[in-house]
């Protein structure tokens, strides 16, 4: 028997696709999201320390090479106006601009622009050429500079070579080696579709086109959370206007909403748009049907590049990116104030690019704008619909006129907004590396005072634990408060966490999930212990409330373990400080309020997304693995830190003891589970007597095959000590997630 050589062997079929579980069961829980970016995908190995490598970088040499690159035009992709600066600014902007505050995901922090889907988004057409221009420099400096850092630093150097003074630069972004799978970019299945995120709109066909049916309805739409772009594959907004409708006032609504979701106020928004559009041009020499597949769909011979164009030479003056053909100023490779000068000097008439896209042309204006590649040609000034929003939206106009009259204020605002744009997802200043880190502390960096006192030692820790346990606070209160403090951390943008003790400040002290009345009472007791200890401590030794909250949680966990018959010491690393209210932007921190916390069996409202999916999202933001998530849920149910003291999921007769009862009783086949409204009831199969109530978050550990396999480990008769020790390890990890000083 011989195999037909023309048919695909099964190994090759597996490698090239085939039907997978997700195809059969689309709603299957994506536990694989907790296994992203593991050591198996990292070619540098577990011992690689990027911060140490960065210290070895010839930083000034790198910047010299980047400056030289700016005017070293290559025949395979010639520089517009003889300067690559504008296209590198676009590259950097689009790397950082995917960040959104809702869940902290996106942004430049992990070099994700190299991978799908970002490397093939319609809004990123031809940015692949910018990264390829950088390859010789990246190759030269190797692992001393990550792609993630290089993509941002290059934009800074580009601005500097065009006469702009930047606010600074911080390194510290570590590369990942595969696409992020946890970022929800929207549910549309066509490029530039916006129908799902607004509930109406055009499905999109891969080009930026007007949609007459939408005219007059643009202001009515509300963008789906946590998205911060109006269409699938855009960074922010459609430059032609909402759904392609060239209405600058309607476009201002989209601009304000999307930029706000990236933590930008109106002044920062105006500065960023005008500053970015001081440089370079857009490209729309021909129609989109000349443009080939994006990088992820291009042939092997393209070697990771995409959008090969059949229009003329396909490059330089024949380039096609957005389909728009706009140059804003007469000095497109030089910083200046001409964007605002032109914006207000001229009246504007609607026209179309050679590709048929809506854009605006100055009326009766002289041809003062240079051609990007032909010195003998001049053009009249042009603008995008979204540029005109800065003049015709009343709030934006006020800011724009101030910048027109005060160029220095504009330059300062752009420098600060650009730094915020490119560093917003890096977390606290403790992560910043390099010689150009600004000295000024900015409130959006969530600053925390430096620790200037001596830290507690082992004897102090033991004494403080004893005081905490003798204070009258329950194990549930101690563990619950520590969890509430630490579990705000987001691995996406490195915000939140226990350091700073912001749980005692607005807005966190008032969040319903934190049970404000109970929290205030617990904090009052802990503050009393802190004052008493600090007053009697030797020398300059002190303990911060941030440290004491975590230490009290450790004491609670140890007490719960003792109640289960296991002696354990929870790791504790002092060194946290207490932030002040003036260091805490209430609006900025409000996005950290959990809509759900499955670890506390809490949901703020009824959501269309199942509670177990929200648990998974929370676990992913906490950088937990599936086993860590599993053991934490089981342990926290056994202790019972449920919001409001609810007993859902508390499958034990001894709440407060760190037992494996949650798993043992969930998997007990003598219990039959049935839905009961939004909950589930577990009843004795023989008598019908109600034993337990549980939520979707609880029951998923017996329902999902992967989670059940983990639950079985902890439900086993020999798992008593393993369960406790695994819980303690996962607990300690969460408590220290924001301790970048320990890494």
From Swiss-Prot:
It catalyses: H2O2 + AH2 = A + 2 H2O; 2 H2O2 = O2 + 2 H2O. The keyword Transmembrane does not apply. Keywords: Heme, Hydrogen peroxide, Iron, Metal-binding, Oxidoreductase, Peroxidase. The active site is at residue 94. Signal peptide: none annotated. Formation of the three residue Trp-Tyr-Met cross-link is important for the catalase, but not the peroxidase activity of the enzyme. Heme b binds at residue 277. Binds 1 heme b (iron(II)-protoporphyrin IX) group per dimer. GO terms for biological process: cellular response to hydrogen peroxide; hydrogen peroxide catabolic process. Its EC number is 1.11.1.21. NCBIfam families: cat_per_HPI (TIGR00198), PRK15061.1 (NF011635). Belongs to the peroxidase family. Peroxidase/catalase subfamily. Homodimer or homotetramer. This is Catalase-peroxidase. It comes from Paracidovorax citrulli (strain AAC00-1) (Acidovorax citrulli).
């Amino acid at each position: 028997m011989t195999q037909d050589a023309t048919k695909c062997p099964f190994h090759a079929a597996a490698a090239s696709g085939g039907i997978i579980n997700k195809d059969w069961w689309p709603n299957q829980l994506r536990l694989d999201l907790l296994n992203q970016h593991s050591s198996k995908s990292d070619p540098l190995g577990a011992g690689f320390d990027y911060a140490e490598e960065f210290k070895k970088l010839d930083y000034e040499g790198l910047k010299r090479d980047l400056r030289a690159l700016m005017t070293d035009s290559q025949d395979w992709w010639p520089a517009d106006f003889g300067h690559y600066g504008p296209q590198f600014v676009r590259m950097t902007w689009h790397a950082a601009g995917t960040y959104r505050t809702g869940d902290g995901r996106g942004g430049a922090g992990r070099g994700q622009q190299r991978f799908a889907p970002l490397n093939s988004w319609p809004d990123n057409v031809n940015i692949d050429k910018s990264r390829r221009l950088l390859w010789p420099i990246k190759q030269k400096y190797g692992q001393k500079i990550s792609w993630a850092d290089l993509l941002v630093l290059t934009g800074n150097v580009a601005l500097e070579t065009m006469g702009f003074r930047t606010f600074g630069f911080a390194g510290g972004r570590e590369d990942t080696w595969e696409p992020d799978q946890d970022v929800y970019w929207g549910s549309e299945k066509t490029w530039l579709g916006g129908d799902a995120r607004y509930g109406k709109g055009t499905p999109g066909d891969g080009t930026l086109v007007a949609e007459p049916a939408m005219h007059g309805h643009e202001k009515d739409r509300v963008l789906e959370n946590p998205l911060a772009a109006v269409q699938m594959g855009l960074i922010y907004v459609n430059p032609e206007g909402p759904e392609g409708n060239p209405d600058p006032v309607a476009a201002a609504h989209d601009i304000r909403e999307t930029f706000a979701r990236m933590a930008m106020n109106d002044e920062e928004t105006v500065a960023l748009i005008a500053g970015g559009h001081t440089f370079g041009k857009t490209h729309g020499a021909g129609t989109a049907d000349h443009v080939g597949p994006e990088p992820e769909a291009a042939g092997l011979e393209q070697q990771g590049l995409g959008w090969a164009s059949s229009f003329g030479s396909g490059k330089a003056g024949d380039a096609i990116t957005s389909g728009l053909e706009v140059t804003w100023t007469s000095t497109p490779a030089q910083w200046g104030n001409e964007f605002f000068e032109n914006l207000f000097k001229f009246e504007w008439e609607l026209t179309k690019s050679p590709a048929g896209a809506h854009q605006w042309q100055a009326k009766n204006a002289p041809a003062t704008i240079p051609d990007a590649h032909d010195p003998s040609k001049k053009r009249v000034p042009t603008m995008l619909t979204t540029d005109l929003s800065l003049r015709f939206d009343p709030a934006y106009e006020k800011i724009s006129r101030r910048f027109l009259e005060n160029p220095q204020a504009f330059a300062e605002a752009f420098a600060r907004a650009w730094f915020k744009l490119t560093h917003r997802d890096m977390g606290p200043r403790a992560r910043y590396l390099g010689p150009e880190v600004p000295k000024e502390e900015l409130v959006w960096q969530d600053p925390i005072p430096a620790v200037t006192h001596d830290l507690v030692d082992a004897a102090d820790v033991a004494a403080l634990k004893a005081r905490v346990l003798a204070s009258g606070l329950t194990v549930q209160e101690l563990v619950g408060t520590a969890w509430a403090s630490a579990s705000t951390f987001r691995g996406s943008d490195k915000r939140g966490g226990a350091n700073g003790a912001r749980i005692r400040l607005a807005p966190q002290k008032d969040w319903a999930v934190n049970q404000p009345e109970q929290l205030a009472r617990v904090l009052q007791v802990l503050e009393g212990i802190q004052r008493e200890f600090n007053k009697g401590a030797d020398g300059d030794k002190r303990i911060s409330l941030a440290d004491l909250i975590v230490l009290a949680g450790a004491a609670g966990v140890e007490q719960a373990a003792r109640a289960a018959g296991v002696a354990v010491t929870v790791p504790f690393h002092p060194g946290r400080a207490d932030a002040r209210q003036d260091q805490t932007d209430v609006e900025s921190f409000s996005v950290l309020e959990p809509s759900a916390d499955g670890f506390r069996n809490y949901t703020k409202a009824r959501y269309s997304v199942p509670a177990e999916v929200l648990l998974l999202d929370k676990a992913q933001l906490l950088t937990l693995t599936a086993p860590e998530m599993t053991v934490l849920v089981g342990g926290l149910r056994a202790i019972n830190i449920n919001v409001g003291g609810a007993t859902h999921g508390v499958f034990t007769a001894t709440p407060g003891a760190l037992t494996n009862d949650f798993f043992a009783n969930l998997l007990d086949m003598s219990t039959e589970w049935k839905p009961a409204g939004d909950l589930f009831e577990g009843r004795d199969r023989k008598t019908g007597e109600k034993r337990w109530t549980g939520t979707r978050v609880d029951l998923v550990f017996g329902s999902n095959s992967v989670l059940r396999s983990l639950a079985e480990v902890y439900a086993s008769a020999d798992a008593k000590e393993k369960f406790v020790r695994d819980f303690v390890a996962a607990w300690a990890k969460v408590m220290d997630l924001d301790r970048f000083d320990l890494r």
